[in-house]
Amino acid sequence: ASDVYKRQDQLNAQARHALMGNLGIQYTYADEDRVEATMPVDHRTRQPFGILHGGATLALGETVAGLGSMILCQPDEIVVGMQVSGNHISSAHEGDTVRAVATIVHKGRSSHVWNVDVFTSTNKLVSSIRVVNSVMKKR
């Protein structure tokens, strides 16, 4: 398994100029079974009505599950997303910060399945997301 999760500051710095940085996503915890990150509900992640955009929520879910799978992979492997689906249960409003908690459901040789729950700052469940990642050998 990779020790990438031990370098959260480095991961957050690298993400600054990618989708994660554009959405304000910050990793806050990571180990081989769980990854957590936060994302602000602001002009970058909200709908015109001032609530969290479902697409931004799914991007947050895929981000934490992707890091989780990277942690589980060997140095000669890469991870790509295969499937993301989510149920949006309640809303988060502009000015809040949501927290994603990804937990591993299946650690297979060629695929990983993650459950990601997204909460408001008051621990209200916003979305429940399922992510399937494919594990492949580097070419």
Language model regions located:
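Beta-rich strand-turn-strand
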Residues: 78, 89-115, 119-128
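Conserved GNAT-family N-acetyltransferase fold
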Residues: 39, 61, 116, 129
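A short acidic/small-residue loop/turn micro-motif
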Residues: 106, 133-135
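Short, small-residue-biased leader/transition segments that mark boundaries at the very start
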Residues: 1-5
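Active-site helix/loop of acyl-thioester processing domains in fatty-acid/polyketide metabolism
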Residues: 55-75
